[in-house]
Regions:
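Outer-membrane beta-barrel domain signature
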Residues: 72-79, 89
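Short S/T/G/P-rich N-terminal loop/turn motif that feeds into the first structured element of a domain
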Residues: 1-49, 56-68, 82-116
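Short, flexible helix/strand-to-coil boundary loops that buttress conserved ligand/catalytic motifs
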Residues: 53, 64-65, 74-77
């Protein structure tokens, strides 16, 4: 899985709502693309605007980066002041099995998961 994370702050020219509206427009089309696992946008209490895309594979993300939709995303980013952009390449995903493993007492081998 590959995750794109964007965070930006409002500028004197564009408000947080302006950025959020632009991102929401992208979310609708992005979610329909093959290989997209999810796409969302939101604003937190300090007015930072967040945009996240998750893709099944790196080839899916590469296809996305070459798309017209991504060109629209780049145009939004160019209107922001120092947007933070990060690509995370997730190679392992685990669930509660990891919690059980991590909480197992090494000396006894007993799991220490409380199920109250």
């Amino acid at each position: 899985m590959v995750r794109l994370t964007v965070a930006l702050n409002p500028t004197s020219a564009r408000t947080a709502q302006d950025f959020l509206d632009a991102f929401h427009f992208l979310v609708l089309g992005t979610r329909l693309e093959s290989g997209c696992l999810g796409c969302s946008a939101w604003t937190d209490p300090d007015s930072t605007v967040h945009y996240v895309e998750e893709w099944l594979s790196e080839p899916d993300m590469r296809r996305r980066v070459r798309s017209e939709g991504f060109t629209s995303l780049l145009a939004i980013l160019e209107s922001a002041t120092e947007p933070r952009v990060q690509f995370d390449f997730v190679t392992v995903t685990r669930g509660l099995d990891y919690v059980a493993e991590a909480r197992t007492d090494a000396s006894t081998g007993n799991a220490r998961i409380s199920r109250q």
